[in-house]
Amino acid sequence: MALAQGLVTFGDVAVDFSQEEWEFLDPAQKNLYRDVMWETYSNFISLDLESRFKTDTSSSDKGICEVYSLQWELIEKIKNLSPQGSGLSDDQECKHKTGLQKEPQEGYFGQLKITSEKVTYEKHSFLSEYQRVQNGEKFYECKECRKTFIRRSTLSQHLRIHTGEKPYKCKECGQPFRQRAHLIRHHKLHTGEKPYECKDCGKAFTVLQELTQHQRLHTGEKPYECKECGKAFRVHQQLARHQRIHTGEKPYECKECGKTFRQCTHLTRHQRLHTSEKLYECKECGKAFVCGPDLRVHQKIHFGEKPYACKDCGKSFRICQQLTVHQSIHTGEKPYECKECGKTFRLRQQLVRHQRIHTHERPYECLECWKTFSSYSQLISHQSIHVGERPYECEECGKAFRLLSQLTQHQSIHTGEKPYECQECRKPFRLLSQLTQHRSIHTGEKPYECKDCGKAFRLYSFLSQHQRIHTGEKPYKCKECKKAFRQHSHLTQHQKIHSGT
């Protein structure tokens, strides 16, 4: 396609359909076409090259209008295709003229190369591209992880995950990014620009995609469905993360210990265990946290804020996840099943913790004493032993605790509350853990098995005590005579000899 040197118009790279052709497209094709047109146009306005465009002062206004009539026509078409009915501001409409660009830009229809010497553009057929998506064909394979992609540009972006390349750097703060779109989105943090506003609640967003995803909160729309279990999601990334549960894929590996994770955020959080880094500090009490969500949950303790209420019983919670977990108590739903023993759980985290019984995995290690734990919460609880901190005090008796959950459990002693009832015998309990242990009496379940002799136990604590027979470990020592015992109860009984009771 030959054009004037250094000048490319939006019409040169946009794919257009006649009215007759448009009628033959189904809704999915029209939606894809709309998204493609938006991306193409967004790439053009993001080039920010209008300052290099020089209008010929000898040209009449009429001549200029004739030259750019096609661009305006296509822009109007995009506006009509937009879900909002009008997506372009006046400023954006003025940015459809482009000049020179040093680096190539890749999009849905091919690769656009703009240089000062020549302009080339290779178009791919829109409908053949759509057909490839429909058929699930993936032509470009990553040699590192064998993942395949429909477009070469997507493969190029993916390869930067393996190489660590981040060629797009923010001029304000120097933060690098793998994709130019990520840099553009990040730059709006510095400018404070949030041009996309939700008409339902007034919340504003930096990018259109965030607004589209947010609006699904109001509409309840969940267009992305898992083919394995039928669970639906608002955002495609949520579906992609969820599918790793079924595939077992854990692409994010810790270079320190080799542990792998399904999500990049989980790897980032895990790596702070090695560095002991706690970036997020509470301004109220100075307590620091490994990750932002932990800080936000903690801050609600100071404010007393519990915005999430259960419609069934009225109980309120600080975070939405707690409400979701609580609601499964009313529904009785237990969608997570252990493949080893068939036991089902309300929460995926409960299943993961349970599976460590079978694998004997204890992935969380204390950097102070090197003791290992099967869950992160156990590690956090243990670490407060070393610092001696007990920030949670009971207003009734003044007893202090390391964890808020310990204080909550303790307070039920004063109130006499026993909210957890066994459905078999109606016996009530103060703690859920007590109810869980009690249930095994009715079921006869003994999930904790000794590897040395095969004997099974109802509780993990029983297994731990039993294993000391094989190891010879006697951790409880008498201060009077230095005699050691396997169990604390044996030590207590022995000490009565010295006291004369």
UniProtKB/Swiss-Prot annotation:
May be involved in transcriptional regulation. It holds the Pfam family zf-C2H2_6. PROSITE patterns: KRAB (PS50805), ZINC_FINGER_C2H2_1 (PS00028), ZINC_FINGER_C2H2_2 (PS50157). SUPFAM superfamilies: beta-beta-alpha zinc fingers (SSF57667), KRAB domain (Kruppel-associated box) (SSF109640). Keywords: DNA-binding, Metal-binding, Nucleus, Repeat, Zinc, Zinc-finger. Belongs to the krueppel C2H2-type zinc-finger protein family. This is Zinc finger protein 14. The keyword Nuclease does not apply. It is found in: Nucleus. Residues 8-80 form the KRAB domain. One of its GO terms (cellular component) is nucleus. GO terms for molecular function: DNA binding; zinc ion binding. The keyword Repeat applies. PANTHER family: RIKEN CDNA 6720489N17 GENE-RELATED (PTHR23234:SF10), ZNF44 PROTEIN (PTHR23234). GO terms for biological process: blastocyst hatching; regulation of DNA-templated transcription. A zinc finger (C2H2-type) spans 140-162, 168-190, 196-218, 224-246, 252-274, 280-302, 308-330, 336-358, 364-386, 392-414, 420-442, 448-470, 476-498. Gene3D superfamilies: 6.10.140.140, Classic Zinc Finger. It comes from Mus musculus (Mouse). The lineage of its organism: Eukaryota, Metazoa, Chordata, Craniata, Vertebrata.
